[in-house]
Amino acid sequence: MIRLPAVAGAFYEGEEDKLKKQIEWSFLHPLGPGKIPQVPPQKSKRNNLFFIVPHAGYMYSGPVAAHAYYYLASEGIPDTVIILGPNHTGLGSYVSLWPKGKWKTPLGEIEIDEQIAMDLVRESEVIDIDEKAHLYEHSIEVQVPFLQYFFDSKTKIVPIVIMMQTPEISEYLAEGISKIMQKYKDKDIVVIASSDMNHYEPHEKTIEKDNMAIEKILSLDYKGLFNVVEEKDVTACGFGPMMTVLMLAKKFNKKPYVLKHATSGDTSGDKSSVVGYLSVRFGD
């Protein structure tokens, strides 16, 4: 079972060479980390287990996303990356997992970790096996070429799309993922929460609203993050994935570090109506 790319040629370049150059551009951009990381040949104990990464078109959010992938790649090739994304299409279940096969992009195919995927379905009470939610969803797909650029086909993924974004759902998810990470202690597992921040307001307003959410992220306050999103109308699309990694960070005693915060106005130059982007690592 192969999932074909839904947004190649739109959110990112549709040809292999152009896509590789676009990823390199993201790292070397003034808003990016400034250099392309080297993947170490030998594995060592991973410091940063969890990340928040944006998922817009690479021309807008690629440089911000590159900060997270700089740390991820610098610590070696992970065995499995669990990617949590919000559901923008309305298709599928409340929480939908793609169970097996491969995902295809212009950089090739990446394999699903079927063993961990099926164990996650068993361990978490809220995850359904449901491919429909993934067919046209971009929030997970745009993370895959970054992984392929550095790790080729040596890394496997577990894609999970969340439509019902509540603290309770995130609690179940975090508990299930935590059990899996403890069960497979010999495996190098990383979790990515895919989310953009506030949408379609002026640059200054977006920075102000994003900072309210970032304050809760830095205190690992997942319920506070939910309340800010609901009460202050901070239109971060992936607050469910973010709440989940905040809980995981607390369970595994990892601290949050903001790597980069910017908006689409910083890359496009148009600051009248922007989207906020945030890269966070959770490590020691």
UniProtKB/Swiss-Prot annotation:
Gene3D superfamilies from the UniProt entry: LigB-like
CDD domains: MEMO_like (cd07361)
Listed Pfam families: Memo
InterPro entries: MEMO1_fam
Recorded family membership: Belongs to the MEMO1 family.
NCBIfam families the UniProt entry points to: AmmeMemoSam_B (TIGR04336)
Protein name: MEMO1 family protein STK_20620
Species of origin: Sulfurisphaera tokodaii (strain DSM 16993 / JCM 10545 / NBRC 100140 / 7) (Sulfolobus tokodaii)
